[in-house]
From Swiss-Prot:
Homotrimer. One of its GO terms (molecular function) is nucleotide binding. The gene is dcd. Pfam families: DCD. It comes from Escherichia coli O139:H28 (strain E24377A / ETEC). Pathway: Pyrimidine metabolism; dUMP biosynthesis; dUMP from dCTP (dUTP route): step 1/2. GO terms for biological process: dUMP biosynthetic process; dUTP biosynthetic process; nucleobase-containing small molecule interconversion. This is dCTP deaminase. InterPro entries: dCTP_deaminase, dUTPase-like_sf, dUTPase_trimeric. Residues 169-193 are annotated as: Disordered. Belongs to the dCTP deaminase family. The keyword Hydrolase applies.
Length: 193
């Protein structure tokens, strides 16, 4: 069962759930909390690689990722990031989220943006128990026109679901947690699997 707005506010008040900066009550709706777009992005560079062998040797996968992923792009206030049709880009939420070991979160895109062709997450919309950090957004423009994305705009909504008990291996205690405490648009770390 997902938390309702009253429960989300109570969990925030009690410090069991942390969203920083804390959203105003106007952004806590029914069963979700609206989140905004941060100012950090990462894209694929123009490249000539025919493919990335994801099951290849880790050092080769790492080198291929380094060749195709851009450095982090940080926008100044008022600047826009343009996502063209057929392009994939990474970004982050403005908010940093910390979940306890007995709560899982879910990210959903906004219907109004989806109707323009913007996918906010390609597959990864679960936020693990014990997670702490900004949420990485996997943008894809499936529409026909470039989309101007500006830091601070409403980009998605989080919902939260209590678990039957605390997870034995929450994200923040796992040795193999590749994205622990991420604050920026961290590129794929599949080479760390």
């Amino acid at each position: 069962m997902r938390l309702c707005d009253r429960d989300i506010e109570a969990w925030l008040d009690e410090g069991r759930l942390s969203i920083n900066p804390r959203p105003p009550v106007e952004r806590i709706n029914g069963a979700t909390v609206d989140v905004r777009l941060g100012n950090k992005f990462r894209t694929f560079r123009g490249h000539t690689a025919a493919f990335i062998d994801l099951s290849g040797p880790k050092d080769e996968v790492s080198a291929a990722l380094d060749r195709v992923m851009s450095d982090e792009i940080v926008l100044d206030e008022g600047e826009a990031f343009y996502l063209h049709p057929g392009e994939l880009a990474l970004a982050v939420t403005l908010e940093s989220v910390t979940l306890p070991a007995d709560l899982v979160g879910w990210l959903d895109g906004r219907s109004s943006l989806a109707r323009l062709g913007l996918m906010v997450h390609v597959t990864a919309h679960r936020i693990d128990p014990g997670w702490s950090g900004c949420i990485v957004l996997e943008f894809y423009n499936s529409g026909k026109l470039p989309l101007a994305l500006r830091p601070g705009m409403l980009i998605g909504a989080l919902s939260f679901e209590p678990l039957s008990g605390p997870a034995a291996r929450p994200y923040n205690r796992r040795e193999d947690a590749k994205y622990r405490n991420q604050q920026g648009a961290v590129a794929s770390r599949i080479d760390k699997d």
